[in-house]
């Protein structure tokens, strides 16, 4: 019996030892060390002011990262080699080399050192101080977009805020840069003077197309937003009993992570709703908040879909940043924490605990890495992670960027294959529902070789405004370009679905750069033989009379004639228009070389050489204007001489807009807008010649693009203007006709009188003398 008890006791003592297998494999990175050297670090060695360690990874350049602790390290190979502590040149004269904040902005690293911002170009190894900041700052914030080659994406990476945390929000000095931090300018926001509380930070929430100000008041915090419709209210308040570090998860999904030593919060909608992170064991909730776990958080790491937490109690927590909620599970306790340790995701489901190691013989630090395979760890039955219900989730739109212009629609498809017997529910969401609306339909789409059912998901996207299902107070302004991220995930997805990433795509609701307008030119002047295309290509030029043009576009006569070289390579052969028939061009919309539609939106024309020998068929009154319409004269005066062709969708206001209250003082002025709801046309003066027109689509509801082009028209059929006024010509012709009639009547009457006979004889004798004289001249007399 005693032997049996000893065996049982031994078994119970051995079980924990067997189950406590190491969480990770430890390896030490040591490179470039052969012979001992004296420590030589150029410049002032930087250090991080916080007692905690941080690691900032570049979201686009995965091998680039910055370690912030008692030493600072910048790596270009994810710490796969020994590194010398990061330093700043003494020539920068930073004083105390204390770093309070850092941010990767595209191809540069921004550091706040001793309350000033410095820019380090890590590719060129060049330091410079930012300009434009006149007050002390403590933090910089920004985001990065990884879709290279897109101008809209580049704007995201270039945008940076600099600020001092802790001032009253109404008096805080905030600076903004759109040049990756090289140049800053003072940032102003409407109604900021009305806000109450301490300033906790400012962030560009690109996935929501908003700028958010964090307000802290009496241990509670909330976000204030910059633009309609969120600028009329605040985000829901959340606990803020101590300063929280804010981490913006990569991917533009609006995920924010707030953490301190004792708290961890997550927002999936750019701060509108901030929630505590639950701690689970299987399907059971252990704690509704990590605060109740009574741990001290040391390091937090996140990628697009995952979250990891390391505590000073040697606890490692892992969770997914799901579409519905976020929760953590705790792995087995092991000796993995140290004061210098920090967490770092290297790939999906791959986590490393990084610790720098000082070398007494070399200035360069080595790095110890403890690598964890999350998927392998979750297979431990004690974790009760469950089985992933989905075998496959894929879509052609994953990690791509699309553009939706006004009146456009985008169709996306995805494929889901569940495990046999499982019925998972796919969820589609957008980060900015105020701008982008969606409609999703799921249907069966055949079977796999194993007999599993394939499900096809069809997603339709277009502006929320055009769906017609949302209240106008909910939708963002249709005139403002916005951005949104679409995410396809599985509802209540098990934490074991590590490799089953949500499918995301970035949607720019703005200008489609593939669009352009073309003027229809089926019946050109060359086609009808009016102009010779060979002559037009042979350095052709023409003269514009000084009475017909104004170089200042004000309708005043010029002082001299103008010779114009015709750019045939750009314009081709001109359109043909008869001067006496009201005319307007046929404008076509093309995209990627394909015809889309005939443009019916409002547009304006302006002759590029200043010709003013044309007008319009409608006036402000006959066009039905309720307000004084804009015209080229007023637009040009507002723009100045530097931008004569500046009438576009940004500054156009329709005279039919009920919100436009400019009084209609001059109802008889020409109405200079073509297209739209009117039948307005161009009326040419009695003048033949070439007109080169600039055309601009000004309708703000047609496209976010500045759709502009130039084209030429040849006006024909006009007779030359008479020297005398037509009234005088008519009077003279009438008088000559009446005189001819009177002479035709009077001459026969006079020939039968005595005076008439004498006159007739006079003319006969005169004729005979002239005849005789002419004969003598020819030598016949």
From Swiss-Prot:
Residues 750-781 are cytoplasmic. Belongs to the CATSPERD family. Its main location: membrane. The keyword Cell cycle does not apply. The chain crosses the membrane at residues 726-749. This is Cation channel sperm-associated auxiliary subunit delta. It is found in: Cell projection, Cilium, Flagellum membrane. Auxiliary component of the CatSper complex, a complex involved in sperm cell hyperactivation. Sperm cell hyperactivation is needed for sperm motility which is essential late in the preparation of sperm for fertilization. Required for CATSPER1 stability before intraflagellar transport and/or incorporation of the CatSper complex channel into the flagellar membrane. One of its GO terms (biological process) is sperm capacitation. Residues 21-725 are extracellular. The keyword Chaperone does not apply. Component of the CatSper complex or CatSpermasome composed of the core pore-forming members CATSPER1, CATSPER2, CATSPER3 and CATSPER4 as well as auxiliary members CATSPERB, CATSPERG, CATSPERD, CATSPERE, CATSPERZ, C2CD6/CATSPERT, TMEM249, TMEM262 and EFCAB9. HSPA1 may be an additional auxiliary complex member. The core complex members CATSPER1, CATSPER2, CATSPER3 and CATSPER4 form a heterotetrameric channel. Glycans are attached at residues 231, 294, 458, 473, 539, 631. One of its GO terms (cellular component) is CatSper complex. The gene is CATSPERD. It comes from the Eukaryota. It comes from Bos taurus. Keywords: Cell membrane, Cell projection, Cilium, Developmental protein, Differentiation, Disulfide bond, Flagellum, Glycoprotein, Membrane, Signal, Spermatogenesis, Transmembrane, Transmembrane helix.
């Amino acid at each position: 019996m005693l032997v049996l008890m000893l065996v049982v006791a031994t078994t119970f003592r051995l079980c924990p030892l067997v189950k406590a297998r190491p969480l990770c494999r430890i390896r030490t990175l040591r490179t470039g060390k052969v012979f001992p050297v004296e420590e030589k670090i150029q410049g002032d060695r930087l250090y991080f002011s916080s007692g905690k360690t941080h690691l900032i990874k570049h979201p686009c350049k995965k091998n680039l990262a910055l370690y912030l602790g008692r030493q600072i390290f910048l790596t270009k190979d994810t710490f796969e080699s020994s590194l010398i502590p990061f330093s700043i040149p003494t020539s920068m004269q930073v004083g105390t080399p204390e770093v309070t904040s850092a941010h990767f902005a595209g191809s540069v690293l921004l550091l706040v050192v001793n309350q000033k911002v410095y820019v380090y170009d890590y590719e060129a190894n060049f330091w410079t101080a930012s300009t434009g900041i006149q007050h002390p700052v403590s933090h910089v914030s920004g985001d990065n977009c990884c879709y290279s080659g897109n101008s809209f994406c580049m704007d995201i990476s270039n945008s940076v805020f600099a600020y001092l945390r802790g001032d009253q929000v109404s008096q805080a000095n905030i600076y903004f840069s759109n040049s990756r931090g090289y140049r800053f300018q003072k940032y102003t926001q409407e109604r900021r003077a009305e806000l109450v509380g301490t300033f906790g930070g400012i962030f560009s929430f690109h996935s929501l197309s908003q700028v958010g100000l964090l307000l802290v008041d009496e241990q509670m915090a909330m976000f204030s937003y910059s633009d309609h419709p969120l600028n009329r209210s605040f985000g829901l308040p959340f606990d803020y009993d101590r300063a929280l570090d804010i981490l913006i998860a990569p991917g533009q999904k609006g995920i924010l992570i707030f953490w301190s030593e004792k708290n961890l919060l997550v927002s999936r909608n750019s701060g509108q709703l901030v929630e505590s992170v639950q701690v689970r064991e299987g399907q059971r909730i252990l704690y509704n908040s990590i605060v109740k776990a009574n741990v001290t958080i040391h390091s937090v790491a996140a990628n697009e879909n995952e979250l990891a937490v390391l505590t000073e109690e040697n606890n490692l927590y892992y969770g997914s940043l799901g579409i519905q909620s976020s929760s953590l599970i705790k792995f087995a306790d092991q000796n993995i924490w140290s004061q210098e340790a920090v967490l770092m995701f290297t790939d999906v489901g791959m986590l490393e605990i990084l610790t720098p190691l000082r070398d007494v013989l070399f200035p360069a630090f080595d790095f110890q890495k403890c690598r964890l395979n999350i998927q392998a760890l979750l297979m431990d039955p004690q974790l009760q992670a469950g089985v992933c219900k989905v075998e496959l989730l894929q879509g052609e739109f994953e990690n791509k960027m699309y553009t939706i212009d006004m009146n456009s629609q985008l169709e996306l498809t995805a494929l889901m294959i569940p495990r046999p017997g499982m019925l998972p529910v796919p969820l589609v969401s957008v980060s900015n529902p105020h701008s982008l609306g969606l409609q999703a339909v799921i249907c069966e789409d055949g079977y796999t070789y194993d007999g599993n059912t394939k499900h096809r998901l069809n997603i339709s996207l277009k502006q929320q405004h055009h769906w017609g299902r949302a209240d106008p107070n909910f939708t963002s302004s249709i005139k403002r370009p916005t951005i949104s991220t679409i995410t396809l995930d599985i509802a209540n997805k098990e934490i074991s679905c590590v490799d089953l990433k949500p499918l995301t795509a970035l949607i720019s609701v703005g200008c489609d750069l593939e669009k352009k307008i073309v003027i229809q030119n089926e019946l050109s002047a060359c086609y009808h033989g009016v102009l010779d295309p060979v002559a037009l290509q042979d350095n052709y030029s023409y003269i514009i009379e000084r009475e017909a043009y104004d170089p200042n576009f004000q309708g005043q006569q010029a002082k001299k004639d103008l010779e114009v070289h015709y750019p045939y390579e750009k314009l081709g052969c001109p359109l043909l228009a008869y001067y006496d028939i009201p005319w307007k061009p046929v404008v076509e919309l093309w995209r990627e070389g394909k015809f889309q539609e005939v443009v019916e939106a409002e547009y304006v024309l302006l002759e590029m050489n200043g010709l003013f020998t044309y007008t319009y068929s409608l006036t402000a009154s006959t066009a039905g204007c309720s307000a004084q319409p804009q015209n080229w004269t007023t637009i040009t005066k507002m723009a100045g001489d530097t931008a004569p062709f500046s009438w576009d969708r940004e500054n156009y206001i329709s005279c039919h807009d009920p919100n436009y209250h400019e009084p209609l003082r001059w109802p008889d002025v020409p109405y200079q807008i073509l297209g739209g709801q009117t039948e307005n046309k161009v009326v040419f003066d009695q003048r033949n010649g070439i007109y080169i027109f600039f055309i601009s689509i000004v309708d703000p509801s047609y496209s976010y693009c500045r759709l502009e082009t130039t084209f030429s028209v040849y006006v024909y059929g006009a007779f030359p203007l008479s020297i005398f006024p037509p009234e005088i010509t008519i009077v003279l012709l009438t008088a000559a006709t009446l005189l001819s009639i009177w002479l035709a009547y009077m001459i026969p009457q006079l020939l039968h009188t005595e005076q008439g006979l004498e006159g007739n004889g006079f003319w006969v004798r005169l004729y005979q003398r002239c005849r005789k004289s002419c004969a003598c001249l020819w030598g016949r007399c």
